[in-house]
Amino acid sequence: LAFAGLTGNENVWDLYCGIGTISLFLSQKAKQVYGVEIVPQAIEDAKNNAKLNGITNAQFFVGKAEEVLPQFYENAKKTEKITDDTASTGRTDMLRPDVIVVDPPRKGCDEKCLDTMLAMSPERIVYVSCDSATLARDLKILCEEKYELMKWQAFDQFREAHPQAQLQR
């Protein structure tokens, strides 16, 4: 929550949102949160979690982040008659989010997703990663374009778990 720098007026996209844990937490301090997840049951759970907790400022979409976000962005640009050149002068709630949070699988973010995030040009991107190699790869892309790494914090996401595998025959 601290990394997102929310004050209550921000519009946030949460990509790879799962059951909405981060989305619903962020909704406490955001104007609106939009979550995207590929697993339909996870989105149903996110919607149920929002309802159970009386959260009304979170919306959830089923699909791959690398498909949903670009499709939404292109459709919204047409609807709002915004071009890439003029889009940076003003924000619209969903088209120009203040913050994008990503918590991708180990493979990291898809290139199309990263490109769309860059086009949407949020003030902040919060990247949660379970793979340091794909984190480094994706940060390189984001930082080469327009962002600067301001804060980072390492923590063990999988307590007492080791990412090694043993194969036996």
List the predicted regions and their residue ranges.
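Rossmann-like S-adenosyl-L-methionine
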Residues: L1-R169
